[in-house]
UniProtKB/Swiss-Prot annotation:
Protein family membership: Belongs to the small GTPase superfamily. Rab family.
Cysteine pairings via disulfide bonds: C123-C188
UniProt EC number: 3.6.5.2
UniProt short sequence motif Effector region, positions renumbered to this chain: 38-46
Subunit structure: Binds SYTL1, SLAC2B, MYRIP, SYTL3, SYTL4 and SYTL5. Interacts with RPH3A and RPH3A. Binds MLPH and SYTL2. Interacts with UNC13D. Does not interact with the BLOC-3 complex (heterodimer of HPS1 and HPS4). Interacts (GDP-bound form preferentially) with DENND10.
Protein name: Ras-related protein Rab-27A
Lineage: Eukaryota, Metazoa, Chordata, Craniata, Vertebrata
GN (gene name): RAB27A
Length: 221
């Protein structure tokens, strides 16, 4: 796909404590490589990838492929950058929330990150996928899988155990997040909730046209 040759531009935000592997996960997804020498993200950075999304119907059949331009925003996890990070929450449509399976405090802080999202995202119930990263470091693991699953179930969000080192479940986690977003857009008659500048259609309904449907009903956010 050439520049501008897509149906939707969608922004995802990766967040979590410093050192959980956000940059490495996004780099593995976009470039298929692992770089162990990344320095700590200062402020905000992003990567991009083009994908084709095909929704599955109740009968299992897939519809026409939607061309998606993903912007994957990488945020600083340190507290001193928190005000800058939260300023980006409202413009993102989906959130990849990571913790480090070898760092219990990063897991305990997941609740704080979700609280921040509930306060600052485009709605109180945004689409989130929880990732326990560094699953390849099994001998250093301190967070049990059942603990992470229980937390994800408490908030009603999907959970994946990922590894930036070998790529385990990274594509699956991001594809799940994209699927949640596309299904949310499909079922919501009122598209006014969509963060401005995040979703754009080329050759289909414009965001202005989508906003004109406000009087027809609201999205259950």
């Amino acid at each position: 796909m050439s520049d501008g040759d897509y149906d939707y531009l969608i922004k995802f935000l990766a967040l979590g404590d410093s050192g959980v592997g956000k940059t490495s996960v996004l780099y593995q997804y976009t470039d298929g490589k692992f770089n162990s020498k990344f320095i700590t993200t200062v402020g905000i950075d992003f990567r991009e990838k083009r994908v084709v999304y095909r929704a599955s119907g109740p009968d299992g059949a897939t519809g026409r492929g939607q061309r998606i331009h993903l912007q994957l925003w990488d945020t600083a996890g340190q507290e001193r950058f928190r005000s800058l990070t939260t300023a980006f929450f409202r413009d993102a449509m989906g959130f990849l929330l990571l913790f480090d399976l070898t760092n219990e405090q990063s897991f305990l802080n997941v609740r704080n990150w979700i609280s921040q999202l509930q306060m600052h995202a485009y709605c109180e119930n945004p689409d989130i996928v929880l990732c326990g990263n560094k699953s390849d470091l099994e001998d250093q693991r301190v967070v049990k899988e059942e603990e992470a699953i229980a937390l994800a179930e408490k908030y009603g969000i999907p959970y994946f155990e990922t590894s930036a080192a070998n790529g385990t479940n990274i594509s699956q986690a991001i594809e799940m997040l994209l699927d949640l977003i596309m299904k949310r857009m499909e079922r919501c008659v009122d598209k006014s909730w969509i963060p401005e500048g995040v979703v754009r259609s080329n050759g289909h309904a414009s965001t202005d046209q989508l906003s004109e449907e406000k009087e027809k009903g609201a999205c259950g956010c």
